[in-house]
């Protein structure tokens, strides 16, 4: 009887620990200079073009030129 009670309590303890780890890992954030996305947020600053930065700067691409 004691073995059964101990194994059940250990099993429940493992379930509780796994739930706590899931909450901690899903609520983590990333420092500036690391990859980010909508589901992986930055700790401070913003997610600009997939990278955590303090400020977002506009990026200008190459303009198309007409050739005659």
Curated annotation (Swiss-Prot):
Residues in the signal sequence: 1-26
Annotated GO CC locations: extracellular region
Subcellular location: Secreted
Molecular function, one GO term: toxin activity
Keywords (A to Z) from UniProt: Amidation, Cleavage on pair of basic residues, Disulfide bond, Secreted, Signal, Toxin
Propeptide feature: residues: 64-68
Location of Phenylalanine amide modifications: 60
Disulfide bonds: 29-43, 36-48, 42-52, 47-56
Tissue-specificity statement: Expressed by the venom duct.
This protein's domain notes: The cysteine framework is XI (C-C-CC-CC-C-C).
UniProt protein name: Conotoxin Eb11.7
Phylogenetic placement of the source organism: Eukaryota, Metazoa, Spiralia, Lophotrochozoa, Mollusca
